Curated annotation (Swiss-Prot):
This is Golgi-associated RAB2 interactor protein 2. It comes from Bos taurus (Bovine). GO terms for biological process: flagellated sperm motility. Keywords: Cell projection, Cilium, Flagellum. Signal peptide: none annotated. It holds the Pfam family GARIL_Rab2_bd.
Length: 397
């Protein structure tokens, strides 16, 4: 098929079956544009040629049982610039093609202007042209979407070489222009980045330089001498930093966090019957969140006081509220509740414990103790009896 495509135009030229238009005459696409309907694209020179669409292997693609014939034109949309930037595609109308005519005759015959219709307008910035097969005079058209089309030049044999050389030169020119444009865009993007960084850096430097002046001119201290807080008025410097504050705090008012007081209470319980004497240290973080825990602790203490009998005549409130200073030894911290810490101290011995220890001793020890007490009681009696007898003897003598 390739051989037939290459040789058939030569035979047709030898028989003079078709007339080849003069190269100096404008093409059919340019004549159609000069008609006035497409005024923005009337900007010669225009390079135009007839192509047939093929696949990657060079096989012809048929549309409605006919070869897909297309006229491709490259021109400039701006008359003042000579660099082309537009790709135009035109097709024949269905009435222009006759079934009785041979295929190559219909392809090589120049169509009439009224039957040529402009169907596509593609900016060259979205199109990439390249030479796919120089031997068979095929070019590749790749769109920005990624789709690729392969076109084979269809022209008289006497003008194929010269016409394809023009297309090769045009493709190289377009690729060079595209490379220059990409470099210019990269340089412009880099310059924009550097300009933005320079601007932000200058603003930062200006802010840093202006901050000491702000401190010296707009410092105000609070009324509390223990907590000296410096507030700065930025109302006159909004143009420098361009920072908006959405809070409703006045200028000279400084917000203070609520203070948390740490209170250490040392209580010692020694006069409760039935309960072992114990001393404790309670560390409470006074705040609104722990009032409930503190109240529960007080209620628990009252219940303990009610259950036992107090030996002192002091009231419960005095017993609970009067703190005592004790020496803390053998500290053992335990976690009590959420925020209360209690340390247990070594309790002092009570009389109840002594009685308990006495009761816990074995019977033999207790009997020995009782015998010792009786012996101690009998000793003065014997001494008294001896003294009495000695006195009686003295009287008798």
């Amino acid at each position: 098929m390739k051989k037939s495509n290459r040789k058939s135009p030569t035979r047709i030229d030898e028989k003079d079956d078709i007339c080849v238009p003069d190269s100096k005459d404008p093409g059919e696409l340019q004549n159609m544009l000069n008609g006035g309907e497409y005024a923005p694209f009337v900007s010669p020179p225009i390079l135009e040629s007839n192509f047939i669409q093929v696949n990657r292997r060079g096989e012809s693609i048929y549309l409605h049982n006919r070869a897909n014939w297309v006229t491709v034109g490259i021109c400039s949309s701006n008359p003042t610039t000579k660099t082309p930037n537009v790709m135009l595609l035109a097709h024949l109308t269905p009435t222009a093609q006759k079934d009785s005519e041979p295929l190559f005759t219909s392809l090589l015959t120049s169509p009439s202007p009224e039957n040529l219709v402009l169907t596509r307008f593609l900016p060259l910035q979205f199109v990439t042209l390249s030479v796919h097969d120089a031997e068979n005079m095929r070019i590749k058209v790749k769109l920005v979407s990624g789709r690729a089309y392969y076109l084979q030049l269809c022209a008289p044999a006497c003008k194929q070489e010269a016409l394809f050389c023009q297309w090769v030169e045009l493709i190289s020119l377009l690729n060079k222009e595209k490379a220059k444009a990409s470099k210019v865009s990269e340089v412009s993007s880099l310059s924009e980045i550097t300009n933005s960084t320079d601007i932000t850096g200058s603003v930062d430097i200006m802010d840093i330089a202006a901050f000491p002046a702000i401190q010296t001119s707009h410092l105000s201290t609070c009324s509390d001498p223990n907590n000296d807080v410096e507030s700065v008025d930025f109302s006159e410097f909004t143009d420098i930093t361009d920072v908006t504050d959405d809070t409703d705090i006045p200028e000279n008012e400084v917000t203070e966090a609520p203070d948390i007081n740490i209170v250490t209470e040392v209580t010692e319980v020694t006069d409760i019957c039935g309960v072992t004497a114990s001393s404790g240290v309670r560390v409470v973080f006074e705040n609104d969140d722990i009032l409930k825990a503190k109240q529960e602790e007080k209620e628990k203490m009252e219940n303990i006081l009610k259950s036992g009998c107090l030996r002192d005549t002091k009231s419960k409130n005095e017993f609970r509220e009067s703190p005592k200073r004790v020496t803390i030894s053998n500290l053992a911290l335990t976690f009590e509740g959420e925020r209360c810490f209690q340390t247990t101290l070594t309790p002092e011995e009570d009389e109840t414990e002594k009685s308990k220890e006495m009761s816990d001793r074995p019977r033999e020890i207790r009997t020995m103790d009782s015998e010792s007490t009786t012996l101690k009681a009998e000793e003065p009696r014997s001494r008294r009896t001896d003294s009495d007898t000695s006195d009686k003897c003295k009287l008798l003598n």
